[in-house]
């Protein structure tokens, strides 16, 4: 059989390729012109800085940022944790939104723009974000303080959390009827090596109201961090300890799963807290900043706070049904006092100590901090 010349074969292949391109051209054009989501370079970048957060707050925030981005495909967020000093650094390029705790900033007018419009938060929390009659901080969520008591010193009164639907907590139904709880077991606690421990700070306002009589206090009382106190109580080093509500939720979950131990919690009749997480908008921020803050205080977003044992800022939403969490929510509805976000931390801690040791009445100690 006679073989075709190489030149003839090349011509045939060229004709076939040309025909294939003609057939595929409509599909290629259609694929190139199909609508697509905005590329990163065409999306608005919203920068969010966090200088400090309430326990569990960052986990909630990251989850909510993902949801908000999906609902706003033209915007992407960049989350960064910084120190308050970095915000004031020379030549710092400030973000659009800053999230912080009380004491991080003492001159909000130098950094933040006043907020306006409808703000979905209860008045005691909004008031804590005001400075010189301007609303600089929007409260996003808050925690509180409770006194946890180990079952080892009073096995008859300890409460083992029952299995429930979410992290050892009841599902959100009608709040259970409150019952009278026994007070602090002074005699039983006094027999322990370390009867009571508490971290430094404004939790002492709460502790002073929970104790009518006090056991002997350790030398390092009110000098530790909240994390150190929680670790000590978890290892059963302390007979009782002042914990944040987020720590209480974590301990409840551990106990319900068999990793913790029975305990009970004393909840104050009124909530006094410095555990409020604020958000502020920086001057010149993107318009998307307002949309983000609205989402974070929406009912849908606030419901997710239960995963972290935190409390919502809205007056039209109840998150907990029973247990200490519900008692805290009820107490906050009765009376809620939040330390002003822009008071120096040292001033707030000193005032709380003066109230705890009895040198100042509660009202007098709180007044300069509001």
Descriptions of predicted regions:
Residues 306-370:
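C-terminal capping/gating helix-and-loop segments adjacent to ligand/active sites or protein-protein/ligand interfaces
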Residues 85-100, 105, 225-241:
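Short helices/loops that flank or line small-molecule/ion binding pockets
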Residues 101-146, 157, 177-188:
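Hinge/lid segment of periplasmic solute-binding proteins
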Residues 277-313, 317:
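Bilobed periplasmic-binding protein/Venus flytrap-like ligand-binding cleft at the lobe interface
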């Amino acid at each position: 059989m006679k073989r075709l010349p190489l030149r003839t074969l090349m011509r045939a292949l060229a004709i076939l390729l040309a025909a294939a391109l003609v057939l595929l051209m409509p599909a290629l054009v259609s694929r190139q012109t199909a609508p697509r989501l905005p590329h990163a370079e065409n999306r608005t970048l919203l920068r969010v800085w966090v200088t400090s957060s309430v326990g569990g707050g960052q986990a909630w925030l990251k989850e909510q940022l993902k949801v908000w981005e999906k609902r706003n495909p033209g915007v992407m967020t960049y989350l960064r944790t910084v120190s308050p000093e970095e915000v004031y650094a020379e030549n710092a390029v400030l973000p659009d939104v800053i999230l912080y705790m009380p004491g991080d900033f003492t001159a909000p007018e130098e950094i933040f723009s006043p907020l306006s419009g409808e703000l979905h938060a209860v008045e005691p929390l909004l008031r804590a974000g005001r400075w010189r009659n301007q609303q600089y901080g929007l409260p996003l969520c808050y925690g509180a303080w409770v006194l946890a008591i180990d079952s080892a010193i009073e096995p008859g009164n300890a409460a083992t959390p029952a299995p429930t639907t979410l992290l050892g907590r009841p599902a959100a139904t009608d709040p259970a009827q409150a019952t009278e709880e026994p007070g602090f077991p002074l005699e039983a606690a006094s027999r322990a090596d370390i009867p009571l421990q508490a971290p430094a700070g404004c939790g002492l306002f709460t502790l002073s109201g929970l104790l009518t009589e006090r056991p002997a206090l350790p030398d390092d009382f009110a000098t530790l961090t909240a994390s150190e106190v929680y670790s000590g109580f978890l290892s059963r080093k302390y007979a009782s300890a002042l914990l944040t509500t987020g720590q209480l939720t974590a301990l409840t979950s551990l106990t319900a799963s068999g990793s913790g131990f029975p305990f009970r919690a004393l909840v104050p009749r009124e909530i006094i807290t410095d555990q409020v997480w604020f958000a502020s908008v920086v001057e010149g921020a993107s318009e998307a900043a307002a949309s983000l803050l609205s989402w974070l205080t929406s009912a849908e977003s606030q419901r997710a706070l239960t995963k972290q044992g935190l409390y919502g800022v809205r007056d039209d939403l109840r998150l907990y049904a029973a247990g200490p969490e519900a008692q805290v929510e009820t107490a906050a509805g009765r009376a809620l006092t939040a330390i002003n976000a822009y008071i120096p931390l040292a001033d707030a801690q000193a005032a709380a100590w003066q109230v705890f040791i009895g040198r100042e009445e509660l009202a007098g100690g709180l007044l300069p901090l509001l």
